[in-house]
Amino acid sequence: MSAATIKDPRDVVLAPVVSEKSYGLIDEGKYTFLVDPRSNKTEIKLAVEKIFSVKVESINTINRAGKRKRTKFGWGTRKNTKRAIVTLKEGTIDIFGGPLA
């Protein structure tokens, strides 16, 4: 990789996804993140390993099309998003900063 292609990890991994399904996957060692739609699996893997100091086993990505919504001025669309489900080899990530309620 050249210096021009190296991205800041916080520009690749934007936020954890908080949902019922993502909570259920944590027990299996899988963590779900909202990521930059232009990033690929290799960039996501390097970013997660650097931010959380863990080893990544695999990554599954999901491209989600923005919903079509009615506005005051006609029809518009929300922006497209991308999610990454990251499976860890070992270890855990303290995403939410405390015990689950």
UniProtKB/Swiss-Prot annotation:
Show the stretches that span the lipid bilayer.
none
Question: What keywords were assigned to this record?
Answer: Ribonucleoprotein, Ribosomal protein, RNA-binding, rRNA-binding
Q: What does this protein do?
A: One of the early assembly proteins it binds 23S rRNA. One of the proteins that surrounds the polypeptide exit tunnel on the outside of the ribosome. Forms the main docking site for trigger factor binding to the ribosome.
* UniProt cross-references to InterPro entries, sorted A to Z: Nucleotide-bd_a/b_plait_sf (IPR012677), Ribosomal_uL23-like (IPR013025), Ribosomal_uL23/eL15/eS24_sf (IPR012678)
The name on file for this protein is: Large ribosomal subunit protein uL23
Instruction: Enumerate the Gene Ontology biological process terms.
Output: translation
Report one GO cellular component.
ribonucleoprotein complex
Return the HAMAP family for the record.
Ribosomal_uL23_B
* GO terms of molecular function: rRNA binding; structural constituent of ribosome
Q: Which organism is it from?
A: Arthrobacter sp. (strain FB24)
Extract the Pfam families matched here. Ribosomal_L23
Please state which protein family the record places this protein in. Answer: Belongs to the universal ribosomal protein uL23 family.
Subunit: Part of the 50S ribosomal subunit. Contacts protein L29, and trigger factor when it is bound to the ribosome.
